Regions:
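Second-shell loop/turn segments in exported
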Residues: 17-30, 63-74, 116-119, 154-156
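Alpha-helical hydrophobic/aromatic positions enriched in membrane-embedded helices and signal peptides
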Residues: 17, 36, 64, 89, ...
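Short glycine/serine-rich loop/turn segments
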Residues: 11-15, 47-69, 94-116, 157
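Glycine-rich, aromatic-flanked loop segments that form ligand/cofactor-binding clefts
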Residues: 1-12, 29-56, 76-101
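Second-shell residues forming the walls of enzyme active-site clefts
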Residues: 75-189
Length: 189
């Protein structure tokens, strides 16, 4: 077989979120999610850190880029919704990421702290909007935080360490009652 088949143990590789969005068919995101759920279940995996809910606010972002569905909030919501439904029906636990958003950063958080200088209104109405909608729809059993510093929300702590962000916004304002996980704590950020 091909080297891709060897690296993936024979599992099918699928397009990144931006590739799915480029098809213009959100139902394809659902079908891909169902297929991913089948593959993960066959390997004994029941929890996946996906989908990426980041808005591609900075197309030069080196770590998000094609991992984002779109630079348009409504498209991110629709494609992520279909992905979450596919995972849920396939009995795969989704952990949406990277709360409160990493699509506006300009560097890869694996190598250092990323600071996003959006104002609070922009963060709440654009970056966090997919979480707000999908939490309300009951599609997010788990959310992964990110190590981005948002001075408009918390001048001192990155999202992962911020009580203002995780408790104040995610739990209290958005009403999230599920499991919060974190991105790798050994990243450069």
């Amino acid at each position: 077989g091909s080297s891709a088949a060897i690296r993936t143990g024979g599992y099918q590789l699928f397009p990144k979120p931006m590739g799915l969005r480029a098809t213009g068919d959100s139902k394809l995101a659902y079908e891909v999610a169902r297929a991913i759920a089948r593959q993960m279940k066959s390997a004994g995996i029941n929890w996946l850190h996906s989908p990426v809910l980041d808005i591609n606010s900075n197309p030069d972002n080196p770590s998000i880029n094609t991992r984002a569905y779109s630079d348009r909030v409504e498209e991110v919501i629709e494609y992520a919704r279909q992905t979450c439904i596919g995972f849920k029906e396939g009995k795969l636990i989704a952990a949406a990421k990277h709360f409160p958003g990493d699509g506006g950063s300009g560097r890869d958080g694996h190598y250092g702290i990323t600071v996003v200088h959006f104002d609070k209104e922009t963060i709440l109405n654009r970056e966090i909007q997919p979480y707000r909608v999908l939490i309300k729809e009951g599609l997010l059993p788990s959310i992964m935080s990110c190590h981005v510093l948002y001075p408009a929300l918390d001048e001192e702590y990155v999202g992962t360490l911020s009580k203002r962000i995780l408790t104040g916004i995610l739990r209290e304002e958005l009403g999230f009652e599920g499991v919060i996980t974190t991105d790798s704590m050994t990243m450069g950020a």
